[in-house]
Regions:
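A metal-dependent, Asp-based hydrolase signature
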Residues: 113-199, 204
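C-terminal cap/substrate-recognition subdomain and adjoining C-terminal extension
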Residues: 54-70, 81-84, 88, 92-94, ...
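Electropositive phosphate-/nucleotide-binding environments in soluble metabolic enzymes
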Residues: 77, 172, 287
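Residue-level recognition of hydrophobic positions within alpha-helical transmembrane segments
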Residues: 21-22, 307
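Non-catalytic pre-domain segments flanking phosphatase-related domains
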Residues: 22-104, 112-113, 119-121, 125-132
C-alpha cells in the first residue's frame, strides 16, 4: 500500500495559527473576567459588612440596656406601693421642691453593730488605738457603752456624753487624717456577720430608694445625729450626693497655728492646716434636725425617711402644712434572723407610725434582702 504525501500550504498554516491565537485570547478574556468577577464579589461582601457594622454601632444605647426596675429588693408591700404612687404623681412639683431627707443610722446604715457606728468608733479610739492616750473619764465612758450594749439599755444621757467626748478624743487631728481613721475602721469585718465589712453595712433596699428618687430628679440630703465629717467618710463611694447635702452634728475647726485665739479674732494664713478643735458646736439630734434642715436647706422636704423617735420631729415637720404632697417613712428593725432586730422597739415604732400617719417599712416582711444575699448572721459579737 502506498501513502500519499500530504502537503500543507502556507495558507492553511496561517489559518491554523489564527485559530490558535483566537482561542488563546478567549482563554485570557475568560480568566480576566473571572478575576474581575471575584474582585466584584469581594468588594460587595466587604461593603455589606461595613454597612452592618454601621447599623450596629448606631443602635441607641437604651435599646441594648436592661430595663430599669425600681426597688428590686422589695417585696410587694404598702411602703413600696405608696412611694411609687407618690412618685407617679409629682408632675406638679417643681424640681427645686423635690427634696428627700434620710436619717443615717438604722435608716440607711446598720446601727445594731451592736450599737451605733459612731459609738463603736469612740470605743475603738479609746480602747484600741495605741497612738492615743485616753483619760480616765474617757475610759469610764467607754465602759458605760459596753454595759449599755450588754444590758440592751441605752441611758438618755449617754448619747450626749458620747458626742461631747468624741470631740475631745479627736482633738488636734486634721480632717484628712480623721477621714482616713474612719475609713480604716470601716474596713474591719462587721461584728456578727459573714461576708460583710463594717463600711458596707448599708441597707440595699434603702439605697434603691435613693437611686429611684434621683432618677426622678430629687435632691437627696442625709440628716444625722452623727458628726458631719464622719458621715462624709461613711457614705463615700456608697451614696452619690454632694458633701454639702450632709447635715450632722458639728465639731469646731481651728488652724493648727491658732492657739487660744477665737475664730472671731484669728486670721487664717495661706496653706495652714485645719484641725479638729475638740469642741462640739451643734448636736443635730431630735428637734435640732429641724434646725439643721432650715439652716442648710431652707425649705421643707416632701419625703422623710427615719427609724426612731429621734427622727419624729423632722417627719412631722415635713408632713405638716406642706405646700406639696408629702410623706414620712419609718424603718422597723423587726428582722430577728438576718439582722439584730428588736421586736419591742419595732412594735413601739409601729404604734407611733399609726398615731402620726407615718408609713412603716418592715425589714422582715418588706425586704427580700438587707445587706445582700451572700451576707448571713454568725452570732459572734464582741
Amino acid at each position: 500500500m502506498k501513502f500519499k504525501k500530504i502537503i500543507i500550504s502556507d495558507n492553511t498554516e496561517s489559518l491554523l495559527n489564527l485559530k490558535v491565537r483566537i482561542i488563546i485570547q478567549y482563554i485570557i478574556i475568560i480568566i480576566l473576567l473571572s478575576i474581575l468577577y471575584s474582585i466584584i464579589l469581594l468588594y460587595n461582601k466587604e461593603k455589606n459588612k461595613a454597612r452592618t457594622n454601621i447599623k450596629l454601632n448606631n443602635i441607641p444605647e437604651l435599646e441594648i440596656k436592661d430595663e430599669y426596675i425600681p426597688l428590686k429588693s422589695w417585696n410587694n408591700c404598702l411602703a413600696k406601693n405608696k412611694l411609687i404612687e407618690f412618685i407617679n404623681n409629682i408632675s406638679n412639683i417643681p424640681k427645686e421642691a423635690r427634696i428627700a431627707v434620710f436619717d443615717l443610722d438604722g435608716t440607711l446604715f446598720q446601727e445594731t453593730d451592736p450599737v451605733y457606728n459612731d459609738w463603736r468608733i469612740y470605743q475603738n479610739r479609746v480602747l484600741n488605738d495605741s497612738n492615743y492616750n485616753p483619760t480616765e473619764e474617757q475610759k469610764k465612758l467607754s465602759n458605760k457603752i459596753s454595759k449599755a450594749i450588754k444590758e440592751h439599755i441605752m441611758p438618755d444621757d449617754l448619747e450626749i456624753e458620747v458626742y461631747y467626748s468624741t470631740a475631745e478624743i479627736f482633738k488636734g487631728m486634721a480632717l484628712d487624717e480623721y477621714d482616713k481613721y474612719i475609713k480604716d475602721y470601716l474596713k474591719q469585718p462587721a461584728d456578727g456577720y459573714n461576708n460583710l465589712l463594717r463600711g458596707n453595712a448599708f441597707f440595699l433596699p434603702m439605697l434603691e430608694i435613693i437611686e429611684y428618687l434621683q432618677k426622678n430628679e430629687f435632691n437627696i440630703y442625709i440628716v444625722s445625729a452623727t458628726d458631719r465629717y464622719q458621715v462624709r467618710s461613711v457614705i463615700d463611694e456608697h451614696i452619690n450626693i454632694p458633701k454639702s447635702n450632709i447635715i450632722g452634728t458639728d465639731y469646731e475647726l481651728a488652724s493648727i497655728n491658732q492657739g487660744n485665739e477665737t475664730g472671731y479674732n484669728y486670721k487664717y494664713n495661706k496653706n495652714e492646716k485645719l484641725i479638729l478643735k475638740g469642741e462640739l458646736i451643734f448636736l443635730n439630734s431630735k428637734f435640732n434636725k429641724i434646725n439643721g434642715i432650715i439652716r442648710n436647706i431652707g425649705r421643707k422636704p416632701i419625703l422623710v425617711f427615719g427609724n426612731s423617735e429621734g427622727d419624729s420631729s423632722m417627719a412631722n415637720y415635713a408632713i405638716s402644712d406642706n405646700e406639696y404632697n408629702s410623706l414620712a417613712f419609718m424603718v422597723l428593725n423587726d428582722d430577728l434572723i438576718r439582722e439584730r432586730g428588736n421586736q419591742a422597739s419595732a412594735d413601739k415604732m409601729k404604734k407611733l407610725c399609726d398615731k402620726n400617719n407615718w408609713i412603716h417599712i418592715s425589714m422582715k416582711n418588706d425586704w427580700k434582702t438587707i445587706y445582700g444575699l451572700n451576707v448571713t448572721r454568725n452570732n459572734k459579737t464582741h
